[in-house]
Structure formats: C-alpha cells, structure tokens
Amino acid sequence: MPRLCVCMLVLVLALATFSEASWKPRSQLQDASSGPRTNGALEQHQLEKLGPASHHRRQLGPQGPQHFIADLSKKQRPPMEEEEEAYGWMDFGRRSAEEEDQYN
C-alpha cells in the first residue's frame, strides 16, 4: 500500500510538471483570439502577462516554430573531414579491386 501511494505521488508530480508548460488561463486565450497582432507584439504581450513565475522562461527566449527551424538549419553543415577521408578509403578499395581485375 505505501508503495502504491509513493508511485501515485510521483505520477501526479510528473504530470503537474509537464502540464505546467501547456496550461494557459482563459484570459490569455481570449486575448490572443480577440484581435490580430504581429508576432513580435503578441510575444511581448504574452511575456508581460507571464509575471515573475516565468523568469527562467523569459531568459530562454521565445520558443516558436520559427526558432526551431532556425536551430535545425544551424545543424545542417558541410560534411566533416573525417567523413571525406572515409569516402576516400572506400574509393581506394574500389579502385584497387578494379586494378586487380585489369591485371588478371
């Protein structure tokens, strides 16, 4: 029985932690749908309404889809030298096999 209580407590705490990021009061939902705004103005308005409890989130900055795309584009870079060397070795093996066929 105590083990079940501990498991339930851990489950409730985990759900509360994960749901905190997606929870919004109704007033914020109504404000967002009440009128058209630019993305910058909307983000600034939301940051002002968040208050002191979200100090760490404000330090992280906006986390919209456009920021994820920018992060992904940073990760796409030219192949590393090690990969190029590996391709050279594979090519060397292929050329060696072709040369052996020519001599036989």
Curated annotation (Swiss-Prot):
Keyword Isomerase annotated: no
Residue positions, PTM Phenylalanine amide: F92
Signal sequence residues: 1-21
Record-linked PROSITE patterns: GASTRIN
UniProt PTM: Sulfation on Tyr-87 enhances proteolytic processing, and blocks peptide degradation. Levels of sulfation differ between proteolytically-cleaved gastrins and between tissues.
Region span, Disordered: 23-104
Gene Ontology terms, MF aspect: hormone activity
Phosphoserine carried by residues: S96
GO cellular component, one term: extracellular space
Localisation: Secreted
Keyword Acyltransferase appears in the UniProt entry: no
Chain positions found as Sulfotyrosine: Y87, Y103
One Pfam family from the record: Gastrin
Keywords: Amidation, Cleavage on pair of basic residues, Hormone, Phosphoprotein, Secreted, Signal, Sulfation
Listed Polar residues bias regions: 25-37
GO biological-process terms attached to the record: G protein-coupled receptor signaling pathway; response to food
Domain of life: Eukaryota
Proregion residues excised on maturation: 22-58, 96-104
General function of this protein: Gastrin stimulates the stomach mucosa to produce and secrete hydrochloric acid and the pancreas to secrete its digestive enzymes. It also stimulates smooth muscle contraction and increases blood circulation and water secretion in the stomach and intestine.
Family in the record: Belongs to the gastrin/cholecystokinin family.
Protein name from the UniProt record: Gastrin
